Structures are given as C-alpha cells and as structure tokens.
C-alpha cells in the first residue's frame, strides 16, 4: 500500500527543489550563450531527446522489471547530473555589462510583464487535461496503451524538430506573432481533441502541434525573460517564470482538469481548455504590443 500523505510530501519536496534547479539552469544556459542566446533551443532540445529515450526505455525495462527500482534509477540519474555539473567551466561574467539597474519590483509594475506571465500561466494551465488524463482519454476511445505511448512520443518528437529549427529564424521574427499563432494552434488542438478523439489521423496531426503549444511558447518565454530581466535580475526573473507558470499554472491545471473531468467528462474538459487558450491568444495579440517582443539584431 502507498502512504498517500507520504507520497504527497515526497512530491512536494521534489517539486520545490526541481523547479529551483530548472530556473537556474535556464539562467546559466543563457549566460553561457552570451550573444548567441538565440541558440537556447539547440541546448534545450536535449532534454526532450532524453525524455523520449527514457520513455521508450522505461517501457521496455518495466515489462520485465518491478517498478520498485524506479526511485533508485532516478536517484542515480540525479547524482550523475550533479557530478557532471561540477565539470562545467566557469561561466562568463555578464552581470556587470548590464546598464539596467532597476529592481525586480520595477519590472513587475509593467503591464506587459504581468500580462505575459498570465498568458504563459494560462497556457500551462490548459495543458492540464493533456498532462494528467490524455493517456486515459485516448484509451477510453479505443487506443491501446502502446498507441497512447506512441502519441506521446510523437508530440515530443515534433518538439525536438522545432527546437533544432527555431534558432535559425527566432531573431528575424516578431515573437508576439509566434506566441499568438502558437496559442491559436493550441486552442484548435484542445477543441479538436475534445470533439473528435475517434479519428486517429486527426489525433496524430494534433499531437504534432505540441511543437508550438509547448516548444515555441517556452522558447518565446525564455527570450522574454532574457529581455525584461537582464543581468542580475535574470535568476529571479527565471525563478518567477518557473514558479508562476509551471508551479502555479501547472498545479491549477491539474486540479481544475480533475474537477471538470469528474463533472463534465473528458471531451468537454478539452474543449473548455481550448476556449481558454483562445482567450489567451487574444490577450497576447492585443495586450503585448509593447512587450519588447519585436525583431532584435542581437
């Protein structure tokens, strides 16, 4: 038997420290890249590749091995990551180069900053039904567990492709346009998954949109943080992004999707997520005109 309270505490502690690590890792990545910050997605892509490898590998491993070994495998992986981190070269000093001496509070008084965090959090919130219930949802509509796993892999594969391609044009486009288009595609993705889950070819195509609903939006978000929270503000800006978007947005998405799923069923839950994402797209387009997301030469 699993101690529910004990499991919740373990996950709480893990989430507390893991989110802190992710925020600082993104900050360090941008500092290492210095003027080549547009290459962020070329590094972030390896996390997605690792996800695919572990997902496929775990499916093979746990067909013969008990799940009790999973925590030990996770611990080993984290220890290896920690040891590798000690081998990283000293990062370049970039804080002194920043001429912007405003504090974190000054940044948070700007309406575009608040709107951007709200849009990004809503986008993460509307991923709740996917993250929590997608496997159960497609299985309830006749897909096998293996097919559900392949749909997950397909979505992350599309994300990998976008991460490889994005650095080539991210500096030459208006990121507000990319953000808005990605949110519109997200709205279509959730609504159509909710309305037509029995069409395999459509579900496959919609999974490819994960490249935009996560990959593109995350890349735009990282660039937004870089522009609005430069120098010594970068770590706190990234921590705010991670905590507010993935922490608050992700947890509320999981909670509300569970409540809606129980009350209205899976299809309507996805459709409501799509409508919320559509509202977020309109806020992004009309509310972020002064969000400093235009084309930059460096």
Model-based region annotation:
Residues 177-192:
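Structural signature of the two symmetry-related core transmembrane helices
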Residues 112-153, 218:
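Helix-loop boundary and gating motifs at the non-cytosolic
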């Amino acid at each position: 038997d699993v101690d529910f309270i004990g499991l919740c505490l373990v996950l709480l502690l893990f989430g507390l420290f893991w989110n802190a690590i992710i925020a600082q890792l993104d900050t360090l990545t941008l500092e290492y890249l210095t003027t080549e910050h547009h290459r962020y997605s070329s590094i972030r892509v390896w996390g997605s590749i690792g996800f695919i490898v572990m997902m496929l590998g775990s499916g093979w491993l746990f067909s013969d091995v008990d799940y009790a070994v999973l925590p030990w495998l996770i611990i080993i992986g984290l220890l290896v990551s920690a040891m590798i981190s000690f081998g990283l070269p000293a990062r370049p000093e970039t804080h002194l180069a920043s001429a912007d001496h405003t504090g974190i509070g000054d940044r948070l008084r700007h309406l575009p900053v608040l709107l951007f965090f709200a849009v990004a959090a809503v986008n993460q919130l509307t991923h709740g039904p996917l993250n929590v219930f997608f496997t159960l949802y497609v299985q309830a509509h006749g897909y096998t567990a293996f097919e559900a796993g392949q749909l997950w892999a397909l979505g992350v594969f599309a994300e990998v492709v976008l991460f490889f391609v994005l650095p080539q044009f991210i500096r030459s486009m208006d990121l507000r346009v990319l953000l808005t288009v990605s949110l519109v595609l997200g709205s279509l993705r959730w609504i159509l998954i909710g309305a037509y889950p029995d069409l395999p070819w459509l579900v496959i195509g919609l999974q490819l949109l994960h490249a935009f609903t996560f990959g593109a939006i995350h890349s735009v978000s990282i660039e937004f943080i870089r522009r609005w929270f430069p120098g010594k503000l970068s770590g706190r800006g990234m921590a705010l992004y991670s905590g507010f978007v993935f922490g608050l947005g992700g947890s509320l998405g999981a909670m509300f999707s569970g409540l809606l799923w129980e009350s209205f069923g899976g299809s309507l839950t996805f459709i409501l997520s799509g409508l919320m994402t559509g509202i977020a797209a309109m806020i992004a387009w009309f509310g972020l005109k002064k969000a400093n997301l235009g084309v930059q030469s460096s």
